[in-house]
């Protein structure tokens, strides 16, 4: 572990020199990339330096204890030695976590896709509830939410809604929401008071930059059509809606939220790029992790990850067996308790895997 930490510190010092190099300063992209790399290892380097400093103090205190001391000084030195040993152990645990490989997508913005699944109108209403929940969570963290496309139902729900979330740590926290979300409640239209079960699926995609995934014009078929509203009626007579098909993968994205065809195409391209990037990344990750299943779950969008039980005011995350009797607060966007628990479980699993590999 310590060889790796020393290598990280050496790289940090090298980056310091590079960031003051005139050739780097005059190249905005390289400057941005190197600054981002340095920022990503700063916490590790600072903790490692603190750890080395504590080690030096331990050595000095050990030498002091080997000298001739009066009883009071010896007792003080022993207490200091015990405190330093405790601090060293805590720093070692922090360093182990800091060495866990970071998801390269963690700093990216998010494309959020929610679809009503099993349950008809009630599933569409639940999809709308989930979108409002995520919107409030985003607001609490200072993220910006922009609806990119939506297919609303006439009763206040969504068959599908796609939105962009821009903000610090957006993907690192939202990525755990991937999967099928189940709701158990009495629908407003249910006269007999029976509890119905419905589901909505959530997909969390990292926004892909053009430099990360190159889409060639020859691989994209563009179709235009008139925008339609709820119920299928045409809402304008111009061909402003856009459908993009990525021929090699068969991925299709339609966008009709804007009145401008150009704006719809731009939004559709962002979603298409994210979906193609996600497909390639998932395939690579599945191949790499073929023999390892994460404790947090596979992240498969068909996997039921969470149940929202309204009569019992209960939310259960099935991946980690966490049950919280605060559904009313969760639906108001207070998601940190669940997400923090998922992050901790994920880090613990990765740390165990790292220890096994070593």
Swiss-Prot record:
User: What does the PTM comment state?
Assistant: Methylated by PrmC. Methylation increases the termination efficiency of RF1.
Stated name of the protein: Peptide chain release factor 1
In the record, the note on similarity to other proteins reads:
Belongs to the prokaryotic/mitochondrial release factor family.
Family matches, as Pfam families: PCRF (PF03462), RF-1 (PF00472)
Organism of derivation:
Listeria welshimeri serovar 6b (strain ATCC 35897 / DSM 20650 / CCUG 15529 / CIP 8149 / NCTC 11857 / SLCC 5334 / V8)
In the record, N5-methylglutamine modifications are located at 233
Q: Does the keyword Cytoplasm apply?
A: yes
InterPro entries attached to this UniProt entry: PCRF, Pep_chain_release_fac_I, Pep_chain_release_fac_I_sf, Prokaryotic/Mito_RF, RF-1
